[in-house]
Amino acid sequence: GGVLEDLSTPPPEDMWLKVKSIEDAKDEAEEIKITFENGDPIAVDDESLSAAEILKKLNLIGGNHGIGRIDIVESRATGMKSRGCYETPGGTILLKARRAMESLCLSRDEIVKKDSLMPSYAKLIYDGLWWSNDRVSLQKQIDNFATKVSGSVVIKLLKGNVISLGKESKNSLYDENKASFEESGGFSNQDMQDYIKAVSYTH
């Protein structure tokens, strides 16, 4: 309420408790490694931690780098619009890292399918329907994709930015030779021309 109800006014600085302003955030970049197994984060910088411990650690690290302030206009369960100001430094870092792992371990179609499920999944939780059959059904589909998402991501943090520097996975679908644009790569220009021609026949 109060000042937050005026959308033209920024939230007061003293409202933010966990995330530093960009001006007050650390000036030095920090790199961390996050390890995933079956879609779940299991370690930070090779230190095995519980999910709660990981979130707590990343909340502290991310907050010091000015990461995770969110100021949005959202639709409540009633449909009414309201302003929401949230602090989610750990969640912001984990989302970036998980997306980086998915880009390596899931196919294009799997990523599209999983992403199409997320709005419905999020709405069910937002509306308090965690125990609903719909949420359980969606969870099974999402968990099926997650079984492939294992590996490590190196993340750089600086002044509100979360940057993926490198990633590796035993389930990687990336083939350096096939992906090469060099002449010795897996696909030649003629291969691509033939592919484009074949696809054009179906549209």
Residue ranges and their predicted role:
Residues 152-163, 168-187:
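Low-complexity, glycine/alanine/valine/leucine- and proline-rich hydrophobic stretches
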Residues 202-203:
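Conserved small/polar residues in nucleotide/adenosyl-binding loops
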Residues 81-126:
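C-terminal, non-catalytic macromolecule-binding modules
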Residues 29-31, 67, 150-152, 160-162:
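Active-site lining segments that contact anionic ligands and/or coordinate catalytic metals
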Residues 1-54, 67-71, 75-77:
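Flexible helical/loop "lid" subdomain adjacent to adenine-nucleotide binding pockets
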Residues 130-131, 136-146:
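A conserved acidic, glycine/proline-rich C-terminal tail/linker
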